[in-house]
Every structure is written in C-alpha cells, then in structure tokens.
Amino acid sequence: SFAIGLAIALITALIRISTRGGFFKVIKVIFRFYVWLFRSTPLLVQLFIVYFGLPYLKISGIAPEGIKLDPLTAGIITFSLNTGAYCSETIRAAILSIPNGQWEAAYSLGMTKTKALRRIILPQALRVSLPPLANSFISLVKDTSLAASITIVEMFEVSQQIAAENYQPLIMYCLVALLYAVACTILSWLQGYLEKITSRYVMTSH
C-alpha cells in the first residue's frame, strides 16, 4: 500500500504544482479535493465506506449490483489513497522548497522542465521529504491494525481470536503492542540510518 501510495502522491504533487492552464486547472481542482477529502476524514471511516459502502453504489452498465470488494483489496485501496493524500503534501512542499536558482541552472544547461525535474529537483526533494515520508510509513504500519475492522486477518485480528479462545485479552493485546513497538523502533532506526547516508551524500557532492 505504501508503494502504491507513494506513486499516487508523486503524481498528485506534480499535478498540483503544475502551472499549466486550461482544462488542466479542472484536474488540479479534482486532485486538491481528493487530498482534502482523505486528509479531513478518519481512516476507519474511509475503510468502512470502501468495504461496506461501495456495494450499495449501483452504476448502470458498469456495476449494476454495486462495487463489491474483498477485504484485502478494500484495505489496499483505502490505505493507498490515504497514504497518497498525506504524502502528496509532503512531496509537494519538498519540491517547492528547492530554490528557483536550481531550475534556472538546469535551464541554462539546456535541460527541459521534465529533465530538470527528474535529474535536479526530485533527487533534492527526496532528501528533504525522507524524514516525513518515513514517519508516514511508520504510521501506516500502526494503522494496519484498523484492517481488522473489515475482517482482514492481520496481527491484531489474530490476537483477538486467540484472546477469545483463552480468555486472556490483556496478555494478547500487550503482546501485540510490544510487537508493534519493536517493529516501529526498527523502522525508526532505519529511518535515521537512511538520513545519515543521504546527508553524507549531499556533503560529499558539495
């Protein structure tokens, strides 16, 4: 879900920073609405709408019986769209933080806007956005526990089943909390390691 969400985020960010006019302005409004919607509503509600609500959305000729998704597909779609909305703002802010002089230098070398974005701007924006993107990934790992609400079998769902069988909910939930804490601690360490590598690369490149 995070990889799909990042792809959505990059596309959304690039569309929103585009200065093209005409019909493209309508597309920008649509993507702005998408970001606003998913950033302004709870993730759990989004899961319920996609899994429980879409079956009631009957579209003549396309989905006359509603859009029915299995739990895993509904979870992937929801988490991806939610991640895309949040990360798009991170990437957009990172791109806009790059000084205009970088664009001008790229143009002076004969680069097109697309080539300048790919070779000059995005690599720098990636370094700037790495910490918040890593935090978004860690948050996503913790948010996967919400998938149990639509019957996706994940760690929290399994712990609920075991707790119901042995009548030891406190032990099971504490164990799940510990596992999440260990996983997030490891991810936080990896985040710091990647930040050191990228910082070292920038220092040596200068």
What are the language-model segments listed below?
Residues S1-H206:
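Transmembrane alpha-helices and adjacent helix-loop boundaries
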